[in-house]
Amino acid sequence: MVFSFSVSAGILKGKITDRSGESLPFATVYVHGTTMGTSANAMGEYQLQLPAGTYKIACQYIGYRQSSLSLTIGADETVQYNFQLEDQGLQMKEHVVKASEDPAMYIMRKVIGRRKFHKDQIEAFQTGIYMKALLKTRQTPDKVLGQKVNKEEAGLDSAGKGILLLIEQIATYYRQGGKERTVIHSVRESGDPNGMGVPKFPDVISFYENNIHISSQLNPRGFVSPLNDFAFNFYKFRLEGDFKEGNHTIYKINVMPKRLYEPVFSGNIYVVDEDWSLHSLDLTVTKKSNMELIDTLRIEQVYLPLQRDLWVIKQQVLYPTIKIFGFDFTGSFVTIYNDQKVNEPAPDSIFNEKVISEYDAGANKKDTTYWSAARPVPLLEEEAKDFQDKDSLRQRFERPEYIDSVRRRFNRPKVSSLIIGGYTYRGKDDKFLLRTNALLTGLANYNTIEGLNIAPKFSLAWSLDSANSITGTAALRYGFENGHFNAIGRINYVHSDREWRTKYWSAGVEAGKYVFQFNPNNPLDALYNTISTLFYRRNYLKLYERWNGYLHFTKNHGNGFRWSAKLGFQQRLPLQNSTDFSFAREDMGGFTENMPPEFKGYSWEKHNAVTAGISISYQPGFTYVKYPDYLQPYSSKLPTFTLAYEKGIPSVLDSKVDFDKWRFSVRDNISLKLLGNLAYHLSTGGFLNTSQVNIPDLNHINGNQLTLASPYLESFQVAPYYTYSNQSGLYGEAHLEWQLKGFLTNKIPLLRQLRWYLVTGGNVYYVDQNLYHTEAFVGIDNVGYEKFRVFRIDLVQSWNSMNLPVTAIRIGLSPTSIIRLNLGDRSGEW
C-alpha cells in the first residue's frame, strides 16, 4: 500500500521533455493497466522502481500525446530511458448538436448528468501517498513593517531568493463509509529533524462535488465546480478537439467564466467519451475568483482507468503564488497516489472514529538512505542542497552562543513596543517569558473618575518542566486626579498532560485591589473611552473599586469538554468623578455622574460579597491526530455549548449578597457554501433567587454608544450600557450574522472590483414587552487595500421598549480579516 522499496527491484529512470527539449514538470509515468507509477520532478526527471519482469510503461502529461515503452527489467538493474512527448494532436469528432451552440455543451451535459454517479461510485478507497510540499521566495524585502528581515536565518541568498519550506511525506490513506484515516509512515522536514510535516494531506479536490472547498482562508464560499449541476449558469465551455488514448476518446474542453468575480475556475478539463468521467484537468483560480490570501492557485490532476467506467486519481499538483508585504512566493504541493484500491473493505481495526491521522513510531527519524530508496520523485539539485544547507544552518543556530545572541537582540526594547504590542522578554532556553501592555492596549488612559491614569500590566509564564508551569498576571494603576493607587495579581499552577495536548488543569489564586466596570464583561474599552471623553465629552465609562480574593480552578479534558470553578471575596467601594477636563467644547454636552442613572433605585455603598461560580462548556465532534509521543485534538465544526451558574453567598464574611444566577449559550459558524457563512450566538438565563442583588450582579447586556463597533456576536451596537440591566427570572438573547463573502456584491461593478462584502443580521434581547431591545444591521466588510482589508462599516437600526429607535453607523475591525488588528484591551475584568 505504501511507496515501498526493495533491494531486488530494478529502476527505470530518465527525463521527460517535449520535442524542443523543454522539461515537462510532474509528468506521470506508470505501468500500463495498473495504478503503479510515479511522477517526474519539476525538471522532468523521473525514477520508477519495478520488480523484475516485463512491463508496458506509459508516460503522459496534460496537453501532450501519451508515449509508451515496453521493457524487461531485471533485479538490481537500472534502465535509462528519456521520454519525448509530442503536442496532443487534436481532431474534431462530429457531434449532433444545435447549430447555435458549441459541441462542448453536449459533452458537458453528459458529464454533468454522470457527476453524482462518479461521486458516489467510490464507497471505499485505499491508497499509498507521497507528498512533497515546496514553497520558495522569488523576492524578499529588506524590512517588513519596520522590522528587518533576516534572510540568512531563513536560508535565503543575498538577493532574498531560496526555499522557505520543503517537506516530503509517505503515508497510507483509508476512506470508507464516511470515516477516514491517514497513517503517516515517514516525514522529512528541511531544517527541522523533529518536524512532523502536516498531519492531514491536501485533500483530493473532487470536481465531482458541486462546491469545491479548498480552504476557508482562500474562499469560505468555496468554488463552483465546472461539473456543478448548474454549471451553465457560471461557465462557458468550448470544445478544443479530441484525441485517442488506447481505446478511449478524450475530449479537451476549455472552461471559461461567464462573468468576472464569480468563484469559478478557468482552464481545461479532459473528459473520457462514453464514460463521461474526468481524464485530467488543468484549472486556475485567481483574485478575480473572489480568492483571498493568495494571488493564484493552479490545480493539475491526472486520473487513470482502474476498471471500466472507473477512473481514479493518480496525481494532484497545486501551484500557489502569493505576493504580500514585498514578498513574492511560489510553490508546488505534489501528491502522488499509488496502489489504489476501490470498494475493497478495509479491516474495521483501521478506523477509529476519533483518530483521523496517525504517525508511525520513528516516522521523522528515517535516514537519507531510506529516503533515497523510498521517494518516488527525484529531488531537484536545489532541494537536495536545501536539506544539506538547512541541516548545517540548524547546527549553527542551535549553538548556545547563537541562541543567546538572538535572545538578547529580541529582548532589546523598541519604541514600537511602547505604542502597540507591548514589550516581551524571553529568558534563557525560553523557560521564562514576560510581557507588558502598550499605549494602545491600556498602558495610559483618561476618564472622569481618575483623570489621567497609568495602568501597566504584566503577564509571565515560567516553565518548570515539559508538563508543569507557573503563569501569572499583575496590574498596577494610579489615577493622577483622585490619587488612588491600585495593585492586583493572579498566579496559577498549570499541569499539562504530556501525552494529550490541550489537556490540562490549572489552580490559582487572585488578590488585590483594582477598578472595575459595573458590567463584569467590560463592554467599554478604556482606550475608546479615553477618545470619547477627551474629544467628545462623553464619559461612558463607569467604575468602582474592589478588593478581590479569589480561588480558581480550571480543567480542560482535551476532548471539547472544559469546566472551571471559582470561590471568592469582594469588597466593593463606590467612586465619584474627580475631573471634568476635556478638549471638546462644553456645548458638546456635559459629563454624567459615575453612578449610572439607571441604578438610582439601588443603595450603592461599600459592602462585601462572597460568590461562587462554575462554568461548563462542551463542543462535540473533536477528532485527533496521534503523533508518536502525544495526541493532538483537531478542531470540530459542531456548536459549542456553555452553561454557567453563580451563587451569591450571604452572611459569610459579612457578605451582603444572596442570589442564584444561570446562563446557557450555544454558538456556531455554519458554512452556507456559495451563500457565505452564518454565525450565531444564542443564550438564555436569569435569576433563580433575588434575595440580595447588587449592581455588579445584575443581568447585563454588552451595550455600545460609540461610533467604534463593539465585538460582533457578543454585544449590541446601539444599546445604552446599563438601560437593560435587570434581575429578571428569564431572558433571551440572540446574535445572528450572515457574512455573504462576495455573494451579490460580485455582481455589482464597483463593489466587486473593491472586493467589499455584504454582511447583515440582527441582535435581540428580550425579557418581556416592557424590556426588550432589537437591532438589525447591514454593512460592508473586507474594506481596505490589498491584504490590509481589516475594516467593517455597518448601518444599524434599533427598536426597543423605550420607544427610542436609533439609527447609527458603526465602524469596526473585521473579525474575518486575514490580518488581525487588536486595539484596546478586553482580555479580562482587569
Q: Model segments located where?
A:
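Short, acidic Ser/Thr/Gly-rich low-complexity loop/linker segments typical of extracellular
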Residues: 34-45
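Transmembrane beta-strand segments that form the barrel wall of outer-membrane beta-barrel proteins
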Residues: 97, 282-287, 433-446, 457, ...
